[in-house]
Swiss-Prot record:
Positions bound to S-adenosyl-L-methionine: D134, D163, L164
InterPro entries: Ppm1/Ppm2/Tcmp (IPR007213), SAM-dependent_MTases_sf (IPR029063), SAM_mthyl_Trfase_ML2640-like (IPR011610)
Compositional bias annotation for Polar residues: 301-313
Organism, as annotated: Mycolicibacterium paratuberculosis (strain ATCC BAA-968 / K-10)
Region feature (Disordered): 290-392
Descriptive protein name: Putative S-adenosyl-L-methionine-dependent methyltransferase MAP_4079
Family designation: Belongs to the UPF0677 family.
UniProtKB keywords: Methyltransferase, S-adenosyl-L-methionine, Transferase
Keyword DNA damage: no
Gene3D superfamilies: Vaccinia Virus protein VP39
Function statement: Exhibits S-adenosyl-L-methionine-dependent methyltransferase activity.
Enzyme Commission number(s) of this protein: 2.1.1.-
Compositional bias (Gly residues): 341-351
Record Pfam families: LCM
Length: 539
């Protein structure tokens, strides 16, 4: 049982469970301000400023009290690990929702939404409705704070103020939710705050509200959540921190998060969904963090849980739910080597390690077709991995939706380039460029040919906003190399001339775009540039 909870307790944003949402916002704000952020949440700091000073600001504070660090030297490392974990968790759920809506789902349900601002910051497809469920005062704080700053949701957002321990399915239906249509669900940072019986009831209700094609992602509890020794060690450490803070800063109380949790025996989340016919993939949190470049570490004993990832069951019982399938060193090496030699759709089967063999979802049991690694309709342009600089991949898709190559992140690219025309020079025009739904800077690609002995410029496709990157991929130089550097400090990209034909880009460590400037029916042959030899490769 929880020592600080009751069956019908409620809270303001600065107290009890509500204050934990501010702690998560603090971690997201710290990650957003980092040198190579995995996520971008500009609203996190807005919530912190509105809530005022409190212990929840520790993650985003420039420095902690020296007395605290002297007494607990491991706090900075633990703080850094927490920020990395929250960033990885947020990135996973972001990708999970975008991939589900990219597959055609237009109903999203965020359970215990807290200060999650996905309704405002994600590029939702047109016609998507996002239902946010949480305590009334928490949702009211979020809405009023963002409204004061002029923020507008990027979807049809529907707030459902309700306690998840009560009859929330009826409130969800009354808000307009259609249980006969596929939907995508998330339960992020929720499980330890629910009694075991309430957790089972929550899953039963999700089961009754979902149909074929639906997906669910859950952050599940780790194996040491109920371990008596781990609990005692955590309690002793919190006692020391509380006593120290009472001396150096009496006005800033340190909350006992463990007193808000329900330490009760409960069924493993992965086994529950597997027993009810769902296809489940399990990955521990350390593999999730390693996959996002946030370091490999042991699973945390409490909230570092495991989450959900997709794939049909291949036999055997699932060990739990997980966020994202990790990637071995050998698999990552094969992918990187493939990326250095020509680019394109690098796929060597289910074990090749390419991004197209990972999706963030749990498939509904009624969806018999499910998801297969070699499914022909698996839309490779819908998947990808973050690159070594922490940005999301940028995909190039031709007019028929076919895969045209994957660009490792240019600076902090956060969106996808899709469905651009790849036809004759005459089809291109120099009309006005419009930012896409992400609101970032427009990237214009200009191709230059040598026609009848003279230069002739033709504007290429205008790629809608790539995150907040202001990178300009400039002209192809006729007789020299021109380096271009991202406004956010990305690697210089060189436009290399090969005889009279277009060539690829070389960033020194990665072949970024072997086919970026290719005309499918151009009078000039399309060229690619080999990173090692620089020799041309005609098509």
């Amino acid at each position: 049982m929880s020592t600080a909870r009751s069956d019908d307790d409620s809270w303001e944003i600065t107290e009890s469970v509500g204050a934990t949402a501010l702690g998560v916002a603090s971690a997201r704000a710290a990650e957003t301000r980092s040198e190579n952020p995995l996520i971008k949440d500009p609203f996190a700091q807005v919530f912190l400023d509105a809530a005022g000073d409190g212990v929840w600001n520790w993650h985003s504070a420039p420095q902690l009290p020296p007395e605290l660090i002297e007494a607990e030297p491991t706090i900075p490392l633990q703080q850094q690990a927490m920020v990395g974990y929250m960033a990885s968790r947020t990135a996973f759920f972001d990708s999970f929702f975008l991939e589900a809506t990219g597959a055609g789902i237009r109903q999203a349900v965020i359970l215990a939404a807290g200060l999650d601002a996905r309704s405002w910051r994600l590029p939702w497809p047109a016609g998507t409705t996002v239902y946010e469920l949480d305590q009334p005062r928490v949702l009211e704080f979020k809405e009023s704070t963002l409204a004061e700053h002029g923020a507008q949701p990027a979807c049809n957002r529907v707030a459902v103020p309700v306690d998840l321990r009560h009859d929330w399915p009826e409130a969800l239906r009354q808000a307009g939710f259609d249980a006969s249509a596929p939907s995508v669900w998330s339960a992020e940072g929720l499980m330890p705050y629910l009694p075991a019986a309430a957790q089972d009831l929550l899953f039963d209700r999700i089961q009754g509200l979902t149909v074929a094609g639906s997906r669910v992602a859950v952050e599940a509890l780790g194996p040491k959540f109920l371990d008596p020794q781990a609990r005692a060690k955590r309690r002793e450490r919190m006692d020391r921190i509380q006593a120290l803070m009472a001396r150096i800063d009496p006005d800033r109380a340190v909350p006992r998060t463990d007193e808000l949790w329900y330490f009760e025996e409960r069924e493993d989340v992965g086994e529950w969904f597997g027993r009810h016919g769902w296809d489940v993939r399990v990955t521990p949190s350390d593999e999730l963090m390693a996959g996002y470049g946030r370091g490999r570490r042991r699973p945390r004993s409490a909230t570092s849980c495991r989450g959900t990832c997709s794939s049909p069951r291949s036999g055997g019982r699932p060990e739990g739910l997980a966020f994202r399938q990790g990637e071995s060193r050998a698999r990552r090496h094969r992918r990187d080597v493939a990326g250095q030699h020509g680019f394109g759709n690098q796929c060597g089967g289910p074990d090749c390690g390419s991004a197209q063999h990972r999706r963030a979802q749990v498939d509904h049991p009624a969806q018999q077709r499910g998801f297969s690694d070699d499914a022909p309709d698996a839309a490779p342009a819908e998947r990808g991995e973050p690159g070594e600089r922490g940005g999301q991949v940028v995909r190039l898709v031709d007019a028929r939706g076919q895969h045209r190559g994957v660009l490792e992140p240019l600076a902090t690219a956060l969106t996808q380039v899709r469905a651009h025309r790849m036809s004759r020079v005459a089809d291109h025009h120099d009309g006005p460029a419009r930012p896409g739904p992400g609101g970032g800077a427009v990237v214009k690609v200009v191709a230059q040919h040598l026609v009848a002995g003279r230069r002739c410029q033709h504007p290429r496709n205008r790629f809608g906003p790539i995150g907040e990157s202001c990178l300009q991929i400039g002209q192809f130089a006729a007789r020299r190399e021109l380096p271009f550097r991202s406004a956010l400090g990305g690697e210089p990209i060189q436009a290399i001339r090969t005889h009279r034909h277009m060539a690829g880009f070389d960033a020194g460590t990665k072949c970024l775009a072997g086919q970026l400037g290719v005309h499918r029916r151009s009078p000039h042959r399309a060229m690619r540039c080999s990173r090692r030899t620089g020799r041309r490769a005609g098509r």
